[in-house]
Protein backbone atom coordinates (compact mmCIF):
# COMPACT_ATOMS: atom_id res chain seq x y z
CA UNK A 1 0.00 0.00 0.00
CA UNK A 2 1.48 3.35 -1.07
CA UNK A 3 1.20 6.61 0.86
CA UNK A 4 -1.84 7.81 -1.14
CA UNK A 5 -3.73 4.52 -0.64
CA UNK A 6 -2.83 4.55 3.05
CA UNK A 7 -4.19 8.10 3.42
CA UNK A 8 -7.47 7.14 1.70
CA UNK A 9 -7.86 4.12 3.94
CA UNK A 10 -7.28 6.19 7.07
CA UNK A 11 -9.76 8.84 5.92
CA UNK A 12 -12.40 6.19 5.25
CA UNK A 13 -11.87 4.66 8.67
CA UNK A 14 -12.09 8.06 10.33
CA UNK A 15 -15.32 8.85 8.50
CA UNK A 16 -16.95 5.83 10.11
CA UNK A 17 -16.17 7.29 13.51
CA UNK A 18 -17.26 10.86 12.85
CA UNK A 19 -21.05 10.37 13.20
CA UNK A 20 -20.61 8.85 16.65
CA UNK A 21 -18.31 11.66 17.73
CA UNK A 22 -20.70 14.25 16.35
CA UNK A 23 -23.69 12.62 18.02
CA UNK A 24 -21.94 12.59 21.37
CA UNK A 25 -21.06 16.25 21.00
CA UNK A 26 -24.61 17.27 20.02
CA UNK A 27 -26.44 15.23 22.65
CA UNK A 28 -25.28 17.05 25.76
CA UNK A 29 -27.73 16.48 28.59
CA UNK A 30 -30.46 19.09 29.00
CA UNK A 31 -30.35 20.23 32.60
CA UNK A 32 -31.79 22.90 34.90
CA UNK A 33 -30.56 26.42 34.26
CA UNK A 34 -27.61 28.10 35.94
CA UNK A 35 -28.89 31.57 34.99
CA UNK A 36 -32.29 33.17 34.25
CA UNK A 37 -33.61 31.77 30.96
CA UNK A 38 -36.52 33.00 28.86
CA UNK A 39 -38.77 30.34 30.40
CA UNK A 40 -37.76 31.13 33.98
CA UNK A 41 -38.10 34.86 33.40
CA UNK A 42 -41.62 34.29 32.06
CA UNK A 43 -42.46 32.05 35.02
CA UNK A 44 -41.34 34.69 37.53
CA UNK A 45 -43.18 37.41 35.64
CA UNK A 46 -46.47 35.47 35.78
CA UNK A 47 -46.23 35.37 39.62
CA UNK A 48 -49.63 33.79 40.25
CA UNK A 49 -51.13 30.46 39.19
CA UNK A 50 -53.90 28.11 40.29
CA UNK A 51 -54.07 24.34 40.40
CA UNK A 52 -57.27 22.32 40.19
CA UNK A 53 -57.55 19.10 42.18
CA UNK A 54 -60.38 17.22 40.50
CA UNK A 55 -60.42 13.46 39.98
CA UNK A 56 -61.79 10.23 41.43
CA UNK A 57 -60.84 11.59 44.88
CA UNK A 58 -63.57 14.23 44.51
CA UNK A 59 -66.22 11.51 44.29
CA UNK A 60 -64.98 9.39 47.20
CA UNK A 61 -64.20 12.34 49.50
CA UNK A 62 -60.68 11.04 50.11
CA UNK A 63 -57.52 12.98 49.25
CA UNK A 64 -55.67 9.64 49.37
CA UNK A 65 -58.03 7.71 47.10
CA UNK A 66 -56.27 4.52 45.97
CA UNK A 67 -58.28 3.77 42.84
CA UNK A 68 -60.10 0.77 44.27
CA UNK A 69 -63.52 2.00 43.15
CA UNK A 70 -64.91 1.44 39.63
CA UNK A 71 -64.54 4.08 36.93
CA UNK A 72 -68.32 4.59 37.06
CA UNK A 73 -67.85 6.30 40.46
CA UNK A 74 -66.62 9.36 38.57
CA UNK A 75 -69.75 11.13 37.32
CA UNK A 76 -69.81 14.95 37.36
CA UNK A 77 -73.38 16.09 36.69
CA UNK A 78 -72.72 19.66 35.52
CA UNK A 79 -69.08 19.75 34.44
CA UNK A 80 -68.01 23.29 33.55
CA UNK A 81 -64.25 23.66 33.10
CA UNK A 82 -64.75 27.11 31.60
CA UNK A 83 -66.18 28.25 34.95
CA UNK A 84 -62.97 27.10 36.68
CA UNK A 85 -60.71 29.04 34.34
CA UNK A 86 -62.97 32.09 34.19
CA UNK A 87 -62.88 32.26 38.00
CA UNK A 88 -59.09 31.88 37.97
CA UNK A 89 -58.83 34.69 35.42
CA UNK A 90 -61.06 36.92 37.55
CA UNK A 91 -58.86 36.16 40.56
CA UNK A 92 -55.81 37.39 38.65
CA UNK A 93 -54.12 34.03 37.99
CA UNK A 94 -51.96 33.81 34.89
CA UNK A 95 -51.39 30.07 34.65
CA UNK A 96 -53.40 26.99 35.60
CA UNK A 97 -52.47 23.39 36.40
CA UNK A 98 -54.80 20.36 36.18
CA UNK A 99 -54.49 17.01 37.98
CA UNK A 100 -54.43 14.99 34.75
CA UNK A 101 -53.74 11.87 36.82
CA UNK A 102 -53.67 11.80 40.62
CA UNK A 103 -52.75 8.89 42.89
CA UNK A 104 -56.05 7.07 42.23
CA UNK A 105 -54.73 6.30 38.74
CA UNK A 106 -57.84 7.77 37.13
CA UNK A 107 -56.94 9.71 33.97
CA UNK A 108 -58.93 12.81 32.99
CA UNK A 109 -58.44 12.08 29.29
CA UNK A 110 -59.05 9.04 27.08
CA UNK A 111 -55.67 7.36 27.52
CA UNK A 112 -54.76 4.76 24.91
CA UNK A 113 -55.07 1.10 25.96
CA UNK A 114 -56.13 2.17 29.45
CA UNK A 115 -59.46 1.39 31.10
CA UNK A 116 -59.42 3.62 34.18
CA UNK A 117 -60.18 7.00 32.68
CA UNK A 118 -63.01 9.32 31.67
CA UNK A 119 -63.80 7.16 28.62
CA UNK A 120 -64.79 4.33 30.98
CA UNK A 121 -67.02 6.58 33.13
CA UNK A 122 -70.60 7.88 32.70
CA UNK A 123 -69.26 11.35 31.81
CA UNK A 124 -66.79 10.83 28.98
CA UNK A 125 -65.79 14.49 28.58
CA UNK A 126 -62.07 14.82 27.92
CA UNK A 127 -61.34 17.15 30.84
CA UNK A 128 -57.75 17.72 29.75
CA UNK A 129 -58.88 18.89 26.30
CA UNK A 130 -61.56 21.16 27.79
CA UNK A 131 -59.02 22.55 30.25
CA UNK A 132 -56.48 23.44 27.56
CA UNK A 133 -59.24 24.95 25.42
CA UNK A 134 -60.53 27.09 28.31
CA UNK A 135 -57.02 28.27 29.18
CA UNK A 136 -56.57 29.47 25.61
CA UNK A 137 -59.95 31.22 25.69
CA UNK A 138 -59.17 33.10 28.91
CA UNK A 139 -55.48 33.59 28.08
CA UNK A 140 -53.93 31.55 30.89
CA UNK A 141 -50.88 29.35 30.40
CA UNK A 142 -51.82 25.69 30.88
CA UNK A 143 -49.99 22.99 32.83
CA UNK A 144 -50.47 19.43 34.04
CA UNK A 145 -50.00 17.53 37.31
CA UNK A 146 -49.12 13.83 37.19
CA UNK A 147 -48.69 11.64 40.28
CA UNK A 148 -46.06 8.89 40.34
CA UNK A 149 -47.60 7.20 43.39
CA UNK A 150 -50.49 5.13 41.98
CA UNK A 151 -51.90 2.22 44.04
CA UNK A 152 -54.33 1.38 41.23
CA UNK A 153 -51.48 0.54 38.86
CA UNK A 154 -48.87 -0.47 41.44
CA UNK A 155 -51.13 -2.94 43.24
CA UNK A 156 -50.78 -1.42 46.71
CA UNK A 157 -50.41 1.89 48.55
CA UNK A 158 -46.74 2.43 49.34
CA UNK A 159 -45.11 5.86 49.51
CA UNK A 160 -41.56 4.61 49.14
CA UNK A 161 -41.32 1.40 47.12
CA UNK A 162 -39.64 2.04 43.74
CA UNK A 163 -41.91 1.81 40.71
CA UNK A 164 -41.70 -1.42 38.71
CA UNK A 165 -40.75 -1.33 35.05
CA UNK A 166 -44.22 -2.12 33.65
CA UNK A 167 -45.72 0.82 35.54
CA UNK A 168 -42.80 3.06 34.61
CA UNK A 169 -43.48 2.30 30.94
CA UNK A 170 -47.10 3.41 31.51
CA UNK A 171 -45.86 6.65 33.09
CA UNK A 172 -43.70 7.37 30.04
CA UNK A 173 -46.50 6.50 27.65
CA UNK A 174 -49.07 8.71 29.37
CA UNK A 175 -46.71 11.68 29.69
CA UNK A 176 -45.84 11.25 26.02
CA UNK A 177 -49.57 11.27 25.19
CA UNK A 178 -50.15 14.49 27.09
CA UNK A 179 -47.16 16.36 25.72
CA UNK A 180 -47.42 15.12 22.14
CA UNK A 181 -51.09 16.16 22.05
CA UNK A 182 -50.33 19.49 23.72
CA UNK A 183 -46.76 20.44 22.73
CA UNK A 184 -45.26 23.57 24.24
CA UNK A 185 -47.16 23.02 27.46
CA UNK A 186 -46.01 25.75 29.84
CA UNK A 187 -45.81 23.72 33.06
CA UNK A 188 -45.59 20.11 34.21
CA UNK A 189 -45.56 19.03 37.86
CA UNK A 190 -44.54 15.48 38.79
CA UNK A 191 -45.46 14.40 42.32
CA UNK A 192 -43.93 11.77 44.63
CA UNK A 193 -40.83 11.57 42.43
CA UNK A 194 -38.70 9.84 45.09
CA UNK A 195 -40.29 6.56 43.90
CA UNK A 196 -38.30 6.99 40.68
CA UNK A 197 -34.60 6.32 40.26
CA UNK A 198 -32.28 9.19 39.36
CA UNK A 199 -32.00 7.82 35.80
CA UNK A 200 -35.80 7.62 35.49
CA UNK A 201 -36.22 11.20 36.67
CA UNK A 202 -33.67 12.36 34.11
CA UNK A 203 -35.42 10.38 31.38
CA UNK A 204 -38.78 12.00 32.18
CA UNK A 205 -37.18 15.44 32.36
CA UNK A 206 -35.69 14.98 28.89
CA UNK A 207 -38.90 13.44 27.50
CA UNK A 208 -41.00 16.43 28.53
CA UNK A 209 -38.38 18.93 27.35
CA UNK A 210 -38.47 17.23 23.94
CA UNK A 211 -42.08 18.37 23.45
CA UNK A 212 -41.96 21.54 25.54
CA UNK A 213 -38.37 22.85 25.36
CA UNK A 214 -39.35 26.21 26.84
CA UNK A 215 -41.71 24.75 29.44
CA UNK A 216 -41.21 24.52 33.20
CA UNK A 217 -40.84 21.07 34.78
CA UNK A 218 -41.35 20.84 38.54
CA UNK A 219 -40.53 17.76 40.60
CA UNK A 220 -42.45 18.37 43.80
CA UNK A 221 -40.50 18.24 47.08
CA UNK A 222 -43.65 17.22 48.97
CA UNK A 223 -44.95 18.35 52.33
CA UNK A 224 -42.35 17.28 54.89
CA UNK A 225 -39.35 18.22 52.77
CA UNK A 226 -40.90 21.62 52.05
CA UNK A 227 -41.55 22.32 55.72
CA UNK A 228 -37.99 21.29 56.53
CA UNK A 229 -36.11 23.41 53.99
CA UNK A 230 -38.62 26.19 53.05
CA UNK A 231 -37.34 26.05 49.48
CA UNK A 232 -33.83 27.12 50.43
CA UNK A 233 -32.37 23.94 48.92
CA UNK A 234 -33.35 21.31 46.37
CA UNK A 235 -33.76 17.77 47.66
CA UNK A 236 -31.81 15.06 45.79
CA UNK A 237 -34.97 13.03 45.12
CA UNK A 238 -36.62 16.05 43.48
CA UNK A 239 -33.81 16.46 40.96
CA UNK A 240 -33.76 17.52 38.15
CA UNK A 241 -36.28 20.35 38.47
CA UNK A 242 -36.55 23.86 37.03
CA UNK A 243 -38.37 25.34 40.02
CA UNK A 244 -38.40 24.49 43.72
CA UNK A 245 -41.96 23.69 44.76
CA UNK A 246 -42.90 24.28 48.41
CA UNK A 247 -45.98 22.16 49.15
CA UNK A 248 -48.43 23.72 51.64
CA UNK A 249 -45.51 25.88 52.74
CA UNK A 250 -44.98 29.63 52.51
CA UNK A 251 -41.63 31.10 51.41
CA UNK A 252 -38.99 31.77 54.10
CA UNK A 253 -39.40 35.08 55.96
CA UNK A 254 -36.21 36.50 54.47
CA UNK A 255 -37.47 35.83 50.95
CA UNK A 256 -36.31 33.31 48.37
CA UNK A 257 -32.86 33.51 46.82
CA UNK A 258 -33.07 31.75 43.43
CA UNK A 259 -29.32 31.04 43.36
CA UNK A 260 -29.51 27.52 44.76
CA UNK A 261 -26.51 25.23 45.19
CA UNK A 262 -26.89 21.58 44.28
CA UNK A 263 -23.98 19.13 44.41
CA UNK A 264 -21.41 21.90 44.26
CA UNK A 265 -22.97 23.83 41.38
CA UNK A 266 -25.16 26.94 41.54
CA UNK A 267 -28.45 26.89 39.64
CA UNK A 268 -31.08 29.57 39.08
CA UNK A 269 -34.25 28.13 40.64
CA UNK A 270 -37.31 30.26 41.44
CA UNK A 271 -39.64 29.19 44.25
CA UNK A 272 -43.32 28.35 43.97
CA UNK A 273 -45.45 28.13 47.12
CA UNK A 274 -48.22 25.61 46.42
CA UNK A 275 -51.04 26.33 48.85
CA UNK A 276 -54.29 24.33 49.30
CA UNK A 277 -57.37 26.35 50.22
CA UNK A 278 -59.39 23.60 51.89
CA UNK A 279 -59.96 22.76 55.58
CA UNK A 280 -57.49 20.61 57.57
CA UNK A 281 -57.06 17.08 56.23
CA UNK A 282 -57.87 14.81 59.19
CA UNK A 283 -55.41 11.96 58.44
CA UNK A 284 -52.60 14.55 58.37
CA UNK A 285 -53.76 17.46 60.58
CA UNK A 286 -51.02 20.00 59.72
CA UNK A 287 -51.92 19.78 56.04
CA UNK A 288 -55.02 21.27 54.44
CA UNK A 289 -57.29 19.43 52.00
CA UNK A 290 -56.67 19.51 48.26
CA UNK A 291 -59.88 17.85 47.03
CA UNK A 292 -63.49 18.83 47.66
CA UNK A 293 -65.50 16.64 50.02
CA UNK A 294 -68.84 17.10 51.81
CA UNK A 295 -68.56 19.96 54.29
CA UNK A 296 -65.64 21.50 52.39
CA UNK A 297 -65.18 25.23 52.93
CA UNK A 298 -62.67 27.46 51.17
CA UNK A 299 -60.17 29.69 52.96
CA UNK A 300 -61.33 33.23 53.64
CA UNK A 301 -60.71 35.97 51.10
CA UNK A 302 -58.47 37.75 53.61
CA UNK A 303 -56.23 34.69 54.05
CA UNK A 304 -55.91 34.13 50.30
CA UNK A 305 -55.03 37.79 49.75
CA UNK A 306 -52.47 37.60 52.57
CA UNK A 307 -50.83 34.53 51.03
CA UNK A 308 -50.66 36.30 47.69
CA UNK A 309 -49.05 39.41 49.17
CA UNK A 310 -46.57 37.40 51.27
CA UNK A 311 -45.43 35.48 48.19
CA UNK A 312 -44.96 38.71 46.25
CA UNK A 313 -42.91 40.25 49.04
CA UNK A 314 -40.80 37.10 49.48
CA UNK A 315 -39.93 36.72 45.78
CA UNK A 316 -41.99 33.58 45.18
CA UNK A 317 -44.73 32.54 42.81
CA UNK A 318 -48.01 31.45 44.38
CA UNK A 319 -49.78 28.35 43.06
CA UNK A 320 -53.17 28.43 44.81
CA UNK A 321 -55.17 25.21 44.78
CA UNK A 322 -58.91 25.24 44.00
CA UNK A 323 -61.30 22.31 44.40
CA UNK A 324 -64.29 21.71 42.08
CA UNK A 325 -67.09 19.63 43.63
CA UNK A 326 -68.92 16.52 42.38
CA UNK A 327 -71.05 18.59 40.02
CA UNK A 328 -67.86 19.54 38.18
CA UNK A 329 -68.01 23.21 39.14
CA UNK A 330 -66.32 25.39 41.73
CA UNK A 331 -68.83 25.81 44.59
CA UNK A 332 -70.57 29.18 44.91
CA UNK A 333 -68.93 29.86 48.28
CA UNK A 334 -65.49 29.34 46.75
CA UNK A 335 -66.23 31.65 43.82
CA UNK A 336 -67.54 34.33 46.18
CA UNK A 337 -64.43 34.11 48.39
CA UNK A 338 -62.13 34.26 45.37
CA UNK A 339 -63.87 37.31 43.91
CA UNK A 340 -63.55 39.06 47.28
CA UNK A 341 -59.88 38.05 47.48
CA UNK A 342 -59.33 39.64 44.06
CA UNK A 343 -60.91 42.88 45.29
CA UNK A 344 -58.62 42.94 48.35
CA UNK A 345 -55.53 42.21 46.25
CA UNK A 346 -56.39 44.90 43.72
CA UNK A 347 -57.11 47.40 46.48
CA UNK A 348 -53.69 46.83 48.05
CA UNK A 349 -51.68 46.72 44.83
What are these regions (language model features)?
Residues 1-7:
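Twin-arginine (Tat) signal peptide motif
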Residues 7-17, 25-349:
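Mature catalytic domains of secreted/periplasmic carbohydrate-active enzymes
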Amino acid sequence: MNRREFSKAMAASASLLLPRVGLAASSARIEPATHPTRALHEFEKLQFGVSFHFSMNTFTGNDYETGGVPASTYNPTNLDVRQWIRTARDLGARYAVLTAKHMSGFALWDSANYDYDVAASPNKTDVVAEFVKACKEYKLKHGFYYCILDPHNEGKFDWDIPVKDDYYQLIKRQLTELHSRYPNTFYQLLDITWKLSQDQRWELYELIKKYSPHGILVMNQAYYQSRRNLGRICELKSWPTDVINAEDTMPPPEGHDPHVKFEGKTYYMPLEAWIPTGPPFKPLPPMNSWFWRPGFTTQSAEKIASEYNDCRQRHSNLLLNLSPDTSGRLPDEAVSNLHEAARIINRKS
